[in-house]
């Protein structure tokens, strides 16, 4: 028995030594495509860093991030936990062949502040302002969640937001719920699919009194059939089939101007270079940027629409550009000047606060809605 115990210890030590040697022999990686983030590097040593604990903490992060076959171990861990009956993985629910992000209870003070900021923006604006809150899959597909799984009541919040702000609303919850049986959200990502964005665009056009779009007007293109989104990365669940990204709107008909680098430059409706990387959703408009303008030369009535938005609008804006001369998109995470002043300067008379519920609850940049002075 003692010999068997010693043998087990020796084998385990050899295994650890082998892993350490493997780790030392492998070059460090700068980035994880699977997790879509920068990986920790070997920390700088100094006696001061050792004394204050930052070097030790840095070493822990370094070994955790640079561990050999990290992605395989992460996936194996998630698979083992699933076999033990676990259904929530790092804030993500496994619902059959679909991953759905849990929406936690918000910071109530921040939530109320955001609603107040939007209300003041609506009161100060010289144009029309609408509120469009996009429910996540956890609300529209709540029947798919594990039994008893907690998730924030987004429907109640959307109704409360309409009452608190006093703004006319876009019924995105109703539009998406009506089509809940269709693939309106990605299975491995938190965004809506292009089909979901199409239904969202029609809900917005309906609220604005514009002619609705017809699905038959578009010919979807399968831009990618191997999209593994943010929930794939966050959860460690790597065994589901990848998603398909579709482009519906022709990129030949619209002119795109971007301020991605901080200055005006030609943009793209679809930046296909992203399709070669993990973050394929950023192929819509080229991803995050402070300001982007879509122009449709075929619409000659001078109509302009402003979207104060998050990344959900990247796949929605091309649809709206079918009914407006110009669609302006402002992302307050990067655009830190007055939106009210921008509206006045550009002669825009209609704006929509178009946010996913999760992002709206946590946003700390709505202060930039107000006019200067």
Regions found by a protein language model. Give the residues of each.
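Extracellular glycan-modifying ectodomains
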Residues: 1-373
